Every structure is written in structure tokens, then in C-alpha cells.
Amino acid sequence: MNRIDKTLEKLKANRKKMLSPYITAGDPYPELTVSLMHQLVKSGADVLELGIPFSDPMAEGPVIQRAMERALAHSIHCDDVLNMVRQFRKTDTETPVILMGYLNPIEQYGYDLFAQQAVEAGADGTILVDLPPEEADGVSRVWQKHGLYSIYLCSPTTSAERMNFINQHANGYLYYVSLKGVTGSDALKLPELKAQYLQRKAQSKLPLMVGFGIKTPEMAAQVAEFADGVIVGAALINEIIEAYEAKKDPLQASGALLSSMRQAIDNIGSMV
């Protein structure tokens, strides 16, 4: 069984909500990434999203764009990211790792080789932001051959027909994009988000995890009251880079934010 499914089953059995942090591989410097991954797991992460740096990250706001620029300045590419997963797996064989990014670097790498190497390294799935499921047939077949999961995006504007299509092709869970715009966007409107989320949830065979715009423990808890889980990216990267630039400990800073989110989510999750 894929680690993602094992984790989701365990969360369901324990009536807990998923917490998934996103970091960009190689940011702020390559030697920190594996330590960050372990720190986030210690601080309550259920699933890790590891970003593959790309020069044109169209769905990302300025925080993650700058993170990718910093990683690319260290010449971080697919092989480096996979090596980070390998290093992580030496001491953590259970936490799912999702590789998140854009199609171009993987296309250049070669779909079959990438899937083979990703699974060998210990990755469990991908989120390819610019590959809609309707155009993913070739990639999906390769991923299935190697046992790599495809995690797809859905949003408030996703139609019932498209949700039905996604249901037929997705694995694990769906990434529910809470806002129009880019990662790190402001102004989550919770009543509207809840109503739209529940519409998509009723149409989905898989758990829906909410990402985009979740910045604080309070916000994470409010979303987790109705959602299957939350994904945090830009807020976490802000903590990491601010600590690094202030010559403080990025591990402590990122761990503190994620621990506070974990605690806030668990405090409401036990009542759901």
C-alpha cells in the first residue's frame, strides 16, 4: 500500500486532520532541506510536499517564487531533489513525500526515468500544477506503472463533470485550491470557503485538503473544522527565510509554526 493511503487510513482511524507543509527543495540552501523535512515531521507533519525548483512558477506568489529563485541559484534540479528524498528515507521510511512542481523539468528528465527514480528514492506521488487531468493520460500511465500517485487540484470553480473526471484518475487525495490567484494570497473568506468546499467534497471520492492562504494556527484550525486537512506553504517559507536572514535557526522557527498549527488543528479535530 502507498504511504499516502496508509497515512490517510491512520488519520481517519484516529479522527485527525491531515497537516501537510510545503517547502522548496534547496531553499534557503541545499544542506538544510533534509533537516527541515525531519524537523517538520517532528513538529506534526503528516505528509511532506517538496517543491521542485522551476524558473517560471506561474501559480506561485512572490514568497514561493523567491524561494525557487534562491534554490535555482544553488543549481538545484530534479536529481538533487531526488537525492534529498533518498537522504530523508535513510531515517524516515513512513512519512509520505509528494514532489510538487511543474511539468517542464520532468518532461526534460523523461517521464519514465523520473517516475522510476522518484519511486526508487522514496517519493510517493506528484502534484504537477500545470498538468490538468484531462491532459495527463500519458503521464498517468507511466506513474501507475511505477506506483507513483497523481495528486490533482480542484477549486471552487471546478464543475461536477470535471470532478467526475478527476475522481476516475486521481489517487490519494485532492488539493483544494481555496482562493483564486497565487499561493500566499490574502483574505480567506471562511463562510464562502466552507460552502464551496462542501460542494466539492460531496462530489469527491477522495479526501480534500485545503491549500492557499493558510497563514496562522487560528486559520488552520478554522479550516480544519470542516476540511479533511490543511496545506501550508508560503507562511512556512516566510518563517524559514526570515530566521535565516536574521541569523537565527530556521529549524526552530519552522518547527514552532508547524507545531502551533498541529496543536490548533488537533484541538478542534478531536471534537469533529
Swiss-Prot record:
It catalyses: (1S,2R)-1-C-(indol-3-yl)glycerol 3-phosphate + L-serine = D-glyceraldehyde 3-phosphate + L-tryptophan + H2O. Its EC number is 4.2.1.20. The active site is at 49 (proton acceptor), 60 (proton acceptor). Pathway: Amino-acid biosynthesis; L-tryptophan biosynthesis; L-tryptophan from chorismate: step 5/5. Pfam families: Trp_syntA. Keywords: Amino-acid biosynthesis, Aromatic amino acid biosynthesis, Lyase, Tryptophan biosynthesis. GO terms for cellular component: cytosol. One of its GO terms (molecular function) is tryptophan synthase activity. The alpha subunit is responsible for the aldol cleavage of indoleglycerol phosphate to indole and glyceraldehyde 3-phosphate. Tetramer of two alpha and two beta chains. Belongs to the TrpA family. This is Tryptophan synthase alpha chain. It comes from Legionella pneumophila (strain Paris).
